[in-house]
Each structure stands twice: as C-alpha cells, then as structure tokens.
C-alpha cells in the first residue's frame, strides 16, 4: 500500500472511530485504534518497498523510482525491507550511469541480512561489475571470493566465471 491509500484508510477509520465512540461501541474502538496503529506502523517500517519490488520485477523503473521516493527515511525501514530498498536504488543508479551512487547503495545492501544466498550473491556480483568498470581488480576478486562462498544459481556462477575471466585478462 502506498502512503495515499494508507491515509485514506486512516481517515475512514477515524470516521468509524468517531461513530463507534458516539454510539458507545467501545469494543469496536479498540479494533479501529489497532487498525490505525498498524497503518501508521506499516508506513513507518514497511514503506512502499513491496510495491516497488513488484514494479522492479516488471522492469518498470520509473514507477519503482517514484515508489522508493515516497520513503522519507530509509533508516527506519525494517532490515528485510531496507536490503531490497538499497538493492533497487543501486540498480536504478546503475541504469542511470551513476556508478559511485550505485556502489554506495550496493555496499549498504551487502551489509544487511538476506534470507537467501543467491539474493546476496546478486549484490556482490553487481559490486564486482562496478569495480570491474573502475578497473579496481583487487576489489573485484574480493567480491568474487565472497560470492563464491554463497550458494548461487547456475546463472550466477556463470556470471562469476565471466567476471573472473575478464579480471584475469586485464591483470
């Protein structure tokens, strides 16, 4: 849910709360207050990362960028949301050729916890590619070594091998 939809739900809940208080339905008031509290908490801790992730998977990068821009303070996101936030910000920056900003976001994402190894592997592969562009081969091999310790998909393993071949060719 985006911020606008959450605010509409909160406004309707406040109207319902006023009705419940006026008619002495105090047990309903507790549920409505819980709904309002959850809406505020989810806006603060979840943000629009889930919607942005869906748009990102559909390769709608403008919508992804707009949804991520709705998040006022990414430091307040839950760790499981923050990692995807940083990953998507890094990919958007990479697509717009802002290499240093992309590296910053991917480095933040690499320090956050990931549920699956192949997700963290994509972050490390992106970091290796960025440093390959910068011709910082020592850092590339460090990222490749970290990525090889993870359980990766066959496609990711092929990408790692191609990057390693490029590093060996240019060293």
Predicted regions span which residues?
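Short coil/turn linker motifs that delimit alpha-helical repeat modules in TPR/alpha-solenoid proteins
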Residues: 40, 77-81, 115-118, 153-155
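Amphipathic alpha-helical segments of tetratricopeptide repeats
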Residues: 69-73, 107-113, 145-151
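Alpha-helical segment of the N-proximal tetratricopeptide repeat
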Residues: 45-77
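"A position-specific structural signal for the A-helix of alpha-solenoid helical repeats
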Residues: 50, 81-88, 119-126, 159-166
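TPR-repeat structural position
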Residues: 61-62, 99, 137
């Amino acid at each position: 849910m985006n911020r606008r939809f959450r605010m509409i739900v909160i406004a309707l809940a406040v109207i319902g709360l006023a009705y419940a208080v006026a008619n002495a339905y105090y047990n309903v008031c507790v549920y409505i207050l819980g709904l309002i509290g959850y809406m505020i908490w989810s806006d603060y801790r979840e943000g629009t990362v889930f919607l942005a992730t869906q748009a990102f998977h559909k390769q709608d990068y403008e919508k992804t960028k707009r949804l991520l821009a709705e998040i006022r303070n990414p430091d307040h996101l839950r760790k499981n949301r923050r990692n995807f936030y940083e990953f998507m910000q890094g990919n958007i920056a990479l697509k717009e050729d802002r290499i240093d900003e992309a590296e910053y976001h991917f480095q933040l994402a690499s320090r956050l916890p990931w549920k699956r190894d192949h997700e963290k592997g994509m972050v490390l592969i992106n970091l290796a590619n960025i440093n390959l562009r910068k011709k910082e081969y020592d850092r590339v091999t460090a990222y490749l070594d970290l990525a090889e310790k993870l359980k990766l998909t066959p496609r990711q393993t092929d990408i790692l091998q191609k990057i390693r071949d490029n590093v060996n060719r240019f060293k």
